[in-house]
Amino acid sequence: MVTSAVEIVTLEPQPALAVHGDVAPPDLPGFFGRAFSSVPAAAAAAGVELVGPPFGLFPSMPGETVEVEAGFPVSAATGATAGTGEAEGVHDLLLPGGEVAQALHTGPYDKVGETYVAMESWMGEQGMVPAGPPWESYVSDPEAEPDPEQWRTLVCWPVTRGA
């Protein structure tokens, strides 16, 4: 597992389509698979384009279940709400803009927690604190790259200067 240096970038808010879930950790791969299959169909039906890799946004700290929004950034908001249209559960989401700490995790998904630990340490050293939920952009496609040691996940975490 390799974590790149953490850097601060400024992002614009990004429209996305996503599926929400409260998922037991062992069920996450299946949940992501279903979301990453249904969102492209919903985007096509709404006439918007996918404009980036799939992501998982994590609104709260994991416990017995993980709250997650899984989807894709899209070219424009669609007005979709969960439970409407042909792709039930797919809804508009806005990925946050502003200052974001980013680090590239290379390795299996089950080791990405190590990147979060490194980022939290870095934030503390820089006098920064989380300012919103983190998300992971899954840069590598496991179907195209079968070696988990080569998978790349961009971890993004909104930040602000600590008080």
Walk through the language-model features, giving the residues of each.
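A solvent-exposed interaction/effector surface
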Residues: 1-163
